[in-house]
Amino acid sequence: MILRYLIFFAQLWALCLANVNMFISKEEMNRTFGVKAELNYIEMGNVSSYSTKFHYRVMANIDYLSFTWNAVGIVHYEVYVESDDSSVLPIVRIPLKGTVPESLQDFTVEYRCAGHRSGQFAVSLYFTFKYGNKEPLKVKLRQEKICASRDGRRGLNGGYEGHEVDDTDSIDKAFFVIICIAAAFLLIVAATLICYFKRSKKEDMIPTRLPTSFRNSLKSTKSAQPFLLSTPRDGPPTLSAISSAPCSSSSASGNSIIPSKPRNIDVRRALLQLYQDRDAFQSLPLDMEGTFGEVRYAIWRQVDDVLNGDVDDEEDTFCNQEAVYTKTLKNNASPIQLDRFLSDALLFYNITPHQNLSQVACVASFGRFDRPETVTDFPLVCYRHQGFGNLKKFLTICRHGDKTKGAQTLRTHQLVSLATQVSSAVAHIHKYRIVHNDIAARNCLIAEVNGRLQVQLCDSALSRDLFPADYHCLGDNENRPLKWMSPEAIANELYSSAADVWSLGVLLWELMSLGGSPHAEIDPEEVYTMILKGKRLQQPNNCPDQLYEVMLCCWRVLSEDRPSSEQVVHGLRDFNIQLSQYI
């Protein structure tokens, strides 16, 4: 009898603690929307007002959407789906009634475009969750399915739920086609595996020190690539090693060093030009946050008057959706922090775009910047970005090898390519006489474009708040990235393109060390003294000698002895070409 009571109370307690979670995973968001961020609908029984208001766009080339859910305790559900137009047939691939699984599981909703009409069509997914004596939890999830006009689209009788085909010839033909496709697939898999193992074997053959023939070829073209000679060394670099690095003064002395000057941007005018209505943005969960600022992905819904669908709802006048990377301040930020935030964010404002430069795409507010009295929120600064987000965060994940967070195995040629790309961005801003003053992995974004990694140099807005451990104060009440700075910048605050090149060398080191912390063993107050004594960052594992020589060139004490950013680009490109011969 006592045992029965214990079981009863245990079940009652479980019902009282019951909760449900539902979300779209990072992998599914990346597959369907190109954004590697999780979209939470319900978390421990709490419904996200942000996410449930969001109309998830299911593009024409996407046939289904996967949701992930689980329950804590016993949770019963009911679900049904409806479409506002018969041109779309939504199908939920789970029973319409049942119990939410306790372990994380996926279920899918299929969206079938029927007929020949094109346009966007609203689909609503209704859930009711029941547990214990609590009020039922009702959730409505909205999707918008895009259907492209094409002849021969599968109709409503497209082989679902008992539709039978009696034509034996058709079955035979279908069977034959399936066999052919399977055979072709096996051949493709076999060929892919062979190519993969050959490529892996070839990359594994790349030594830390490239072959003598490669070094000789570099020596024979010394005038064309002055940075890429290989100098065998044991232990950390010394002053003599740095002085003898293959970037002679003759190659660097002709450089025109660009001093750092304020850009004097008219912030109000820039905000007016970049303004967008905040209601057009659907914020996703936090990606990073500090004390005063935060970073999120968001969906920018842009108005397009050309709409072929017949849905009359005002929401559906928004046709194009674009993923953006956003920065904004929290409510506890001060006006001084707002001024600094906007000044930093607009560093690249109004200069010619570059594929490796991340510039502000728009600034959103619920009010209007031409009527300041209507602006009660902090501006949402938006960058076009569909990728992994912050480079430093991405490199750290890759170094730790956490596949659940998107870790990748980065090969030498990929890292050299990223180094070349970010150097190209630095050379681009220097061409417009803009000095960055804070070049580092924390101020870059990384994505995958057409199967290749692409890095973009970004401004330093919010970096001091998001990465406080990278900034230190030397008694002047100014937090500075001392371990990325040149000696003249530390001692005399002399910022220039040459100081940027020093920081660029540290960024190359961050890439090759997969987000390592430079000079981690040195106190910030001692960095300047140690640099003058010849202390330099050690060569990372698997970093080719020629690339490390480029870093040493960037770290020469005298600013006039350093190469220009353009010379660094040329050197890295030449090295990349040579390296590709071994891949």
UniProtKB/Swiss-Prot annotation:
Residues 1-18 form the signal peptide. Residues 195-583 are cytoplasmic. This is Inactive tyrosine-protein kinase RYK. Disulfide bonds join C113-C147. Residues 281-583 form the Protein kinase domain. It comes from the Eukaryota. ATP binds at D287, M288, E289, G290, T291, F292, G293, E294, V295, K327. InterPro entries: Kinase-like_dom_sf (IPR011009), Prot_kinase_dom (IPR000719), RTK (IPR050122), Ser-Thr/Tyr_kinase_cat_dom (IPR001245), Tyr_kinase_AS (IPR008266), WIF (IPR003306), WIF_sf (IPR038677). Residues 19-173 are extracellular. Glycans are attached at N30, N46. The chain crosses the membrane at residues 174-194. Belongs to the protein kinase superfamily. Tyr protein kinase family. One of its GO terms (cellular component) is receptor complex. Residues 22-147 form the WIF domain. It is found in: Cell membrane; Basolateral cell membrane. Keywords: ATP-binding, Cell membrane, Disulfide bond, Glycoprotein, Membrane, Neurogenesis, Nucleotide-binding, Receptor, Signal, Transmembrane, Transmembrane helix, Wnt signaling pathway. One of its GO terms (molecular function) is protein kinase activity. Its main location: membrane. It is a single-pass type I membrane protein. GO terms for biological process: asymmetric protein localization involved in cell fate determination; axonogenesis; cell surface receptor protein tyrosine kinase signaling pathway; establishment of anatomical structure orientation; morphogenesis of an epithelium; polarity specification of anterior/posterior axis; polarity specification of proximal/distal axis; positive regulation of anterior/posterior axon guidance. Has no detectable kinase activity in vitro and is unlikely to function as a tyrosine kinase in vivo. Receptor which may act as a receptor for Wnt ligand mom-2. Plays a role in controlling P7.p vulva precursor cell lineage orientation during vulva development. Regulates pop-1 asymmetric distribution in P7.p and its daughter cells. Plays a role in the migration of ALM neurons during embryogenesis.
